Amino acid sequence: MIYQKQRNTAETQLNISISDDQSPSHINTGVGFLNHMLTLFTFHSGLSLNIEAQGDIDVDDHHVTEDIGIVIGQLLLEMIKDKKHFVRYGTMYISMDETLARVVVDISGRPYLSFNATLSKEKVGTFDTELVEEFFRAVVINARLTTHIDLIRGGNTHHEIEAIFKAFSRALGIALTATDDQRVPSSKGVIE
């Protein structure tokens, strides 16, 4: 199933769709490094993304990065509500040369982000690295996920961010995996 949403503000104009059919993705955020990270997201999560974004990137990349995170989170929440039987929890460690990242995802209905990652530099190219946390906070809050992101070791900032994106994507993919269990994956009987 394809989930689609548009978001138009004074700062950004977004048209985003997400699906779990592994169809080809098309990502155009206007921010090269973010395009790269979201391409990794699609590959490692098993989800397809189509993104057409315009924003005030002449100011900086903040609004487009955060707003894309908001919409991806909202679309994930719609997808999760349609899925009744899924693993719920996902954990992944990803190494990238000198870097090691760990991400734990719980599709809990309780939005929380622990972002424990001190990135080595403030920029990768022109991309402000502080936007990595802003992106994940927007996704996690809007998808209502509990997520712990830990950068255990680092060195190269590009590797650090890439390992975090890959670990999140893999952990989310595991958590979304369908099961044959007919019960809601919560002892409460509900995930809201």
Curated annotation (Swiss-Prot):
<dbReference type="GO" id="GO:0005737">
    <property type="term" value="C:cytoplasm"/>
</dbReference>
<dbReference type="InterPro" id="IPR020568">
    <property type="entry name" value="Ribosomal_Su5_D2-typ_SF"/>
</dbReference>
<comment type="pathway">
    <text>Amino-acid biosynthesis; L-histidine biosynthesis; L-histidine from 5-phospho-alpha-D-ribose 1-diphosphate: step 6/9.</text>
</comment>
<keyword id="KW-0456">Lyase</keyword>
<dbReference type="Pfam" id="PF00475">
    <property type="entry name" value="IGPD"/>
</dbReference>
<comment type="similarity">
    <text>Belongs to the imidazoleglycerol-phosphate dehydratase family.</text>
</comment>
<protein>
    <recommendedName>
        <fullName>Imidazoleglycerol-phosphate dehydratase</fullName>
        <ecNumber>4.2.1.19</ecNumber>
    </recommendedName>
</protein>
<keyword id="KW-0368">Histidine biosynthesis</keyword>
<keyword id="KW-0963">Cytoplasm</keyword>
<keyword id="KW-0028">Amino-acid biosynthesis</keyword>
<dbReference type="InterPro" id="IPR000807">
    <property type="entry name" value="ImidazoleglycerolP_deHydtase"/>
</dbReference>
<dbReference type="GO" id="GO:0004424">
    <property type="term" value="F:imidazoleglycerol-phosphate dehydratase activity"/>
</dbReference>
<dbReference type="InterPro" id="IPR038494">
    <property type="entry name" value="IGPD_sf"/>
</dbReference>
<dbReference type="GO" id="GO:0000105">
    <property type="term" value="P:L-histidine biosynthetic process"/>
</dbReference>
<dbReference type="InterPro" id="IPR020565">
    <property type="entry name" value="ImidazoleglycerP_deHydtase_CS"/>
</dbReference>
